[in-house]
C-alpha cells in the first residue's frame, strides 16, 4: 500500500494487493529519532563519528551529505538491522495530487497480533497478553485496511477484505493463534511457510481458500474482487469465514474506528492503568 501510494511509483502500478500492510501511525519526530538511533552505528563503523550519539544527531540534519550516505549504504548492512521497513513509519501521507492512483485490494486477519504477542515476553500475565492480542489486533487490522482507504481519500478504488476464519468470532477456532498474521497467504497457497501454523485441510477451509483465490483473480483480471468498493458512507468490507464444511462470506460496514478501539481499551477493566502502560 505504501509503494502504491508513493509518488516515486506513479504510473508503475495499475493495481496492487496488500496483505496486513498499510500506512504508518507513528509520530514523525519519534520515528525520526528511532531511525537515527538504528542507523547511527553504521555511521560510526564508516568512521564518520566516534560515538553513536554524535552520529544520530548528524542523521537528523537535512544536509545533502546525510542523504548521500544513506543512499550509498549496501542493502546487506541495512538488512542486518532487522526488518528495517518497519522503522520507516512517519505518519506522513503524500498529498492526493502526488500519489500514484492504483486500485487496491487490502486484506487483514482478525487476530494479527497473536503471533507477535506469543513471541514477546513483556506481557507477563495472561490478562495482559489477552489485552495485547485483542486491541493490538484491532488497531493493526484497522491500520492495514480502513485507515489506508481513509488516507487515500478516493484517489483510487479500494476494497477491504477481513479474514475472520480462526478468530474469536469465527465459526472455526484455530487454537492458540486465532486468525493469525499470515493466514491469508496460507489460504492462498499450501506452499506458504504460514501453512504449518494451522490445519487448513477441512472442506470449509478449502472452500474459503477457493473464494479468496476467486476474489484475487477477479481483482487482477477485471479490476474488481467481486464486492462493493469502500466509501466513507458505507465503509464496505467483506468478511471471510468458514465452518467445517462451507465458506461463510458476508458484506457489512467496517466494524471499528480508531476512536472506538481506543475507547474500548480505556474502558477495559481487565488491567489497571499502570498495567496497560
PLM features per residue range, with description:
Residues 1, 30-38, 177-179:
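NAD(P)H-dependent oxidoreductase Rossmann-fold/reductase module
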Residues 1-30:
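Primarily recognizes the serine-hydrolase "nucleophile elbow" in alpha/beta-hydrolase
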Residues 5-8, 44, 75, 153, ...:
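Sec-exported extracytoplasmic/periplasmic mature domains
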Residues 6, 10, 31-33, 60, ...:
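Extracytoplasmic/cell-surface-exposed regions of Actinobacterial cell-envelope-associated
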Residues 15, 24, 61-206, 222:
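Substrate-gating cap/lid region and adjacent catalytic-acid/histidine neighborhood
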Residues 31-67:
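Helix-rich cap/lid subdomain of alpha/beta-hydrolase
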Residues 153-158, 166-167, 192-277:
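Alpha/beta-hydrolase-fold serine-hydrolase catalytic core, especially in secreted/extracellular enzymes
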Amino acid at each position: 500500500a505504501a509503494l502504491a501510494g508513493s509518488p516515486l511509483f506513479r504510473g508503475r502500478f495499475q493495481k496492487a494487493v496488500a496483505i496486513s500492510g498499510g500506512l504508518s501511525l507513528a509520530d514523525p519526530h519519534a520515528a525520526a529519532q528511532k531511525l537515527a538511533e538504528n542507523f547511527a552505528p553504521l555511521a560510526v563503523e564508516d568512521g564518520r563519528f566516534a560515538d553513536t550519539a554524535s552520529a544520530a544527531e548528524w542523521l537528523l540534519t537535512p544536509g545533502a551529505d546525510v542523504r548521500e550516505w544513506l543512499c550509498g549504504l549496501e542493502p546487506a548492512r541495512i538488512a542486518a538491522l532487522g526488518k528495517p521497513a518497519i522503522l520507516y513509519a512517519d505518519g506522513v501521507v503524500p498529498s492526493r495530487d502526488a500519489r500514484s492512483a492504483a486500485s487496491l485490494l487490502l486484506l487483514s486477519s482478525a487476530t494479527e497480533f497473536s503471533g507477535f504477542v506469543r513471541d514477546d515476553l513483556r506481557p507477563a500475565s495472561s490478562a495482559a497478553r489477552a489485552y495485547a492480542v485483542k486491541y493490538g489486533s484491532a488497531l493493526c487490522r484497522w491500520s492495514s485496511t480502513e485507515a489506508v482507504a481513509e488516507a487515500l481519500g478516493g484517489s483510487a478504488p479500494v476494497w477491504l477484505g477481513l479474514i475472520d476464519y480462526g478468530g474469536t468470532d469465527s465459526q472455526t477456532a484455530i487454537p492458540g493463534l486465532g486468525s493469525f498474521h499470515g493466514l491469508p497467504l496460507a489460504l492462498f497457497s499450501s506452499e506458504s511457510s504460514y501453512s504449518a501454523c494451522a490445519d487448513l485441510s477441512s472442506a470449509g477451509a478449502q472452500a474459503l481458500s477457493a473464494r479468496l483465490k476467486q476474489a484475487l483473480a477477479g481483482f487482477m483480471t477485471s479490476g474488481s474482487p467481486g464486492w462493493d468498493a469502500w466509501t466513507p458512507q458505507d465503509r464496505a468490507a467483506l468478511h471471510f469465514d468458514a465452518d467445517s464444511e462451507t465458506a461463510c462470506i458476508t458484506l457489512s460496514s467496517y466494524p471499528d474506528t480508531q476512536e472506538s478501539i481506543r475507547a474500548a481499551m480505556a474502558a477495559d477493566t481487565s488491567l489497571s492503568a499502570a498495567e496497560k502502560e
